[in-house]
Amino acid sequence: MKSFIAKQYACPVEYTLTLIGGKWKPVILWHLANDGIKRYGEIKKLLIGITHKMLSQQLKELEADGLIHREEYHQIPPKVEYSLTDKGKTLIPILQLMCQWGQENMEHI
């Protein structure tokens, strides 16, 4: 895990947002929760506007925080798959509520 985890947080929400906050992490987790195992290129296609550098960074952080698993297959061409860990799967109800809230409020923006 990252060294910043040792930081003292004012509340559990702050800690949670440190792990899943930002523009891309919740969306990456959402797609892995709904679609299951995905390869890097598949994730990249789903996230319109994300750069290669940003996607790589977000995936590395999610993996370091124990929310996703990276499976590397030693073959030609190289193959890497991403999936939710058990810890990552515990976020599914939160992601579902975020989706529901978005569906109910998106048209009002």
Predicted regions and their residues:
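Basic, amphipathic "hinge/linker" alpha-helix immediately C-terminal to the N-terminal HTH DNA-binding motif
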Residues: 74-97
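Recognition helices and adjacent regulatory flanks at domain boundaries
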Residues: 1-9, 46
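Alpha-helical linker/hinge and terminal dimerization helices associated
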Residues: 65, 94-106
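Basic amphipathic alpha-helical segments that dock to polyanions
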Residues: 55, 59-62
